Amino acid sequence: MTIEHDFFGILGSDDEGEVYWSEQVELGSESVDIDLNSPDEASVSVEALDIAAAMIRSIEDLDSQAKESLVADLSAENSQTLQYIRQAVEELDDEALANALIWDSGDRQIDFLRSLRLQRVGFRPHHTASDEHFAVLDYSISPDDTDTLLVVALDVNGDPVTISVES
């Protein structure tokens, strides 16, 4: 069985009902990898695909929403965002860090967050509950110098569910 969608085209595969789609989109001067996958085609609704397509079409807004959640996380007691910043400052040499920070407003933490580069957005169209990871955004301060990512998971409404650091 396959699903046909105006934005994604024909989805589905012969692999036991799995759904997979990938593409690259431009965000400013950067390319961002986008993928959509579900282990079960039957659990993917057209509405969820429409929401994912709308998020991809407005990738700048999605990026802004995720970065706003990172700013809000700075004040959290166990802030994953602060952990990522500290880890990057320790891991990267001064030159790599200076090259990665493209903003200089005087607020080092905000400049760091504004300088994050969106690497990938993964959509899980079978996760449509308000506490599930519908869109997962992977950020890096310097993709050539570190494999560590700051990951923001958003629900189907675009609200943050979790923020984590992944290596």
Segments and roles (model prediction):
Residues 1-23, 110-167:
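Acidic, proline/glycine-rich low-complexity IDRs
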Residues 1-99:
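Long, contiguous N-terminal structural blocks used for assembly/anchoring
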Residues 61-144:
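Amphipathic protein-protein interaction modules
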